[in-house]
Amino acid sequence: MLQPKRTKYRKQFKGRIKGVAKGGSDLAFGEFGLKAQEPNRVNAREIEAARRAITRYMKRAGRVWIRVFPDVPVTAKPTEVRMGKGKGSVEYWACKVKPGRMMFEIDGVSEEIAREALRLGSAKLSVKTRFVQRIAE
């Protein structure tokens, strides 16, 4: 699973996801892509599950690019522990995804295979997504 090798700080504030993606919203590598339609926190497990679903359907033909990286530590206190006594330990890593953010890109396969592979991948994610295709010039 994806996570940073090292960070400046161990824990982070929760924060809010406001506005739309100002960068990483266009196809940069592949011919087809999966674009987020709503804001949410996508954890590393979801990204990995989506990547597996996409590559499995493509039967390892073509290429997959993951355009998001889980860099936000999400903390949780153990069950049945009273409030207070400090912030909980880091449970998992997540990525704050804004609407318009390109999450996955694929290339080297037909449109039908790409569409179905990305549909299977999007089922693993906690954000609404849509299929996008590069416009031929």
Swiss-Prot record:
GO cellular component: cytosolic large ribosomal subunit
SUPFAM superfamilies: Ribosomal protein L16p/L10e (SSF54686)
NCBIfam families: rplP_bact
The gene coding this protein: rplP
Record's function text: Binds 23S rRNA and is also seen to make contacts with the A and possibly P site tRNAs.
Family: Belongs to the universal ribosomal protein uL16 family.
Top-rank taxon, per record: Bacteria
Entry protein name: Large ribosomal subunit protein uL16
Key words of the record: Ribonucleoprotein, Ribosomal protein, RNA-binding, rRNA-binding, tRNA-binding
Keyword Magnesium: no
An individual GO BP term: translation
Organism of provenance: Rhizobium etli (strain ATCC 51251 / DSM 11541 / JCM 21823 / NBRC 15573 / CFN 42)
GO molecular function: rRNA binding; structural constituent of ribosome; tRNA binding
Matches recorded under PANTHER family: 50S/60S RIBOSOMAL PROTEIN L16, LARGE RIBOSOMAL SUBUNIT PROTEIN UL16M
Subunit structure: Part of the 50S ribosomal subunit.
